[in-house]
Amino acid sequence: MILISNPDKSQWQEILKRPVMNTENLFDTVRSVIDRVKEEGDRAVLDYEEKFDKVMLASLAVSEEEQQEAENLVSEDLKAAIRLAKQNIETFHAAQRFEGKKVQTQPGVTCWQKAVAIEKVGLYIPGGTAPLFSTVLMLAVPARIAGCKEIVLCTPPGRDGKVHPAVLFAAKVAGVNRIFKAGGIQAIAAMAYGTESVPKVYKIFGPGNQYVTAAKQLVSLRDVAIDMPAGPSEVEVLADETANPIFVAADLLSQAEHGVDSQAILITTSVELQQAVKVEVERQLALLPRKEIAEKSLANSKLIVVDSMAEAIELTNAYAPEHLIIETEDYLSVAERIVNAGSVFLGSLTPESAGDYASGTNHTLPTNGYAKAYSGVSLDSFIRKITFQEIKPEGLNIIGPAIELMAANEQLDAHKNAVSVRLGQLENGNGN
């Protein structure tokens, strides 16, 4: 890890640089895979599964028998943990339901919104070094609460042609309708355009590597919506001298083990804490099964000391971390001054792992500084809000002249006329 002390503000941009995920140089490769899936459907997806995931599949769909077999393979303890997490995620997201109300902007002019679920959504769950069954819950539970009619899940199978049992169990618990064995670019293309087996969806959610990210970017240009721009995972710990270096080191390492391009940052007002955390990170790192991944990630990570808590907060808002852990004596007052972060974890007993799994908040969050403009996944991510307006005669008489004047000044005479003909009818005593 890189140790930095009292950086000048002019250095902040350089200090806060993240590992870059450049997807533009992948676009030609990704586009060729997408185009073939569009043209050949299942056959192309099956071929790419053999090429990229090294598995020959008879079909893409996961059968009911496979789901039942998977359920039998998941331990009762893990099932209970998944159900607990699902319950908490459900409770938190159900509380986000939108309740629209009618607003009278003028007498006779009434406006309102109605929340409507996105009918078909696609969830992408990566394979790789660890089964991300928690992400199934984070995406499928709010989709079901929102009322999405079709929830489609794609995930790469293992070399044995099977999906990890915990992923299948989480999908069942969360209410996923259909599951397919497809990963990478081909999975994104299948959900974006549809194949003989995989339904076309209207919005795609979920993390992935740089190829998945590039695929989502390309299909979102014109054909389907996506959740948000994605990048490597990241955490910042904002701490003072009261923080426990053991806890801080554990939190930094929990992020570092995600992947070699993850980033973990400490911003503190205490030199003593900076030094203690460095020692503790090295001690805990040696004990981790995923030590090699975490070790590479730590090369992107920094332990930064600043002069004051005000400066620490300003630097934090400039960084806009995906995950922010605040371990200070007055963490609630510090939290009030945070304006750029994906999800915030308050106090020494609130590890980022809680949000990753079971506190109830969503772990699908903006990375790469996008927390300055994007929110994490929530119930709103799975709905659209349609606006309605109703105008009665009294209302048209009030706002009609203003509309006519504004339309005339924008040289949109047909817009003006649409109001004028109605006002004329009202003057003649005929409002129909």
Question: Where on the chain are the PLM-derived regions?
Answer:
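Conserved small-residue-rich beta-alpha loop and adjacent elements
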Residues: 103-169
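Short acidic-hydrophobic, aromatic-tinged amphipathic segments that line or gate anion-handling sites
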Residues: 1-7, 178-183, 303-308
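A glycine- and small/hydrophobic-rich beta-loop-beta segment
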Residues: 258, 266-341
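N-terminal Rossmann-like NAD(P)+-binding subdomain of aldehyde/semialdehyde dehydrogenases
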Residues: 1-119
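Flexible, glycine/charged-enriched surface loops at secondary-structure junctions
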Residues: 98-103, 225, 262-267, 287-297, ...
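Conserved NAD(P)+-binding/catalytic subdomain of aldehyde/semialdehyde dehydrogenases
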Residues: 175-263
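C-terminal core of ALDH-fold dehydrogenases
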Residues: 318-432
